[in-house]
Swiss-Prot record:
Pfam families: SPOUT_MTase (PF02590). It is found in: Cytoplasm. GO terms for molecular function: rRNA (pseudouridine-N3-)-methyltransferase activity. Disulfide bonds: none annotated. InterPro entries: Alpha/beta_knot_MTases, RlmH-like, tRNA_m1G_MTases_N. It comes from Methanothrix thermoacetophila (strain DSM 6194 / JCM 14653 / NBRC 101360 / PT). It is an enzyme of class 2 (transferase). Keywords: Cytoplasm, Methyltransferase, rRNA processing, S-adenosyl-L-methionine, Transferase. This is Putative ribosomal RNA large subunit methyltransferase H. It catalyses: pseudouridine(1915) in 23S rRNA + S-adenosyl-L-methionine = N(3)-methylpseudouridine(1915) in 23S rRNA + S-adenosyl-L-homocysteine + H(+). PANTHER family: METHYLTRANSFERASE, RIBOSOMAL RNA LARGE SUBUNIT METHYLTRANSFERASE H. S-adenosyl-L-methionine binds at L62, G94, L113, S114, K115, M116, T117, F118. Its main location: cytoplasm. Specifically methylates the pseudouridine at position 1915 (m3Psi1915) in 23S rRNA.
Length: 145
């Protein structure tokens, strides 16, 4: 399975870069994952940039009004996509202004990481960690407690 994270904005701080690299390395045995960064501008222009980078398959938009899932539920959702033969999943992370309505309309699932608001850099790390956790749950490997 191929996964693509399409994120608005660039991670500039070294500690966020290190955390992202850490989880990207840990995810490599489970999935091909690439990250595309879209320039931060007004949400409509960001939306066009995001939509231009979709790689087919299922699209998940991270949105504060999206569906909440536990780690176990995310693992089950991901496992179902694998069983269905889904070739790719796009994960979209908006910038400070959120996602355009066009992007939300195009998404197959709107997912909320929490009721709390996080900086978009942290949202990327949280998503990577939850994807790693989901694969460990699916493979029944130790990590999730």
């Amino acid at each position: 399975m191929h996964m693509r994270i399409i994120a608005v904005g660039r991670i500039r701080e070294r500690f966020w870069q290190d955390a992202a690299s850490y989880y990207l390395r840990r995810l490599s045995p489970y999935t091909r994952l690439d990250v595309v960064e879209v320039r931060e501008e007004d949400p409509i222009k960001e939306g066009r940039g995001i939509l231009a980078h979709l790689c087919g398959g299922v699209t998940v938009a991270l949105d504060e009004h999206g569906e909440s899932m536990s780690s176990q539920e995310l693992a089950l959702w991901l496992q179902n996509r694998i069983v269905e033969g889904c070739g790719s999943i796009n994960w979209i992370i908006g910038g400070p202004e959120g996602l355009s309505q066009d992007v939300l309309n195009r998404s197959d699932l709107q997912l909320s990481l929490s009721k709390m608001t996080f900086p978009y850099q942290m949202a990327r790390i949280l998503l990577l960690e939850q994807l790693y956790r989901a694969f460990k749950i699916i493979k029944n490997e130790p990590y999730h407690r």
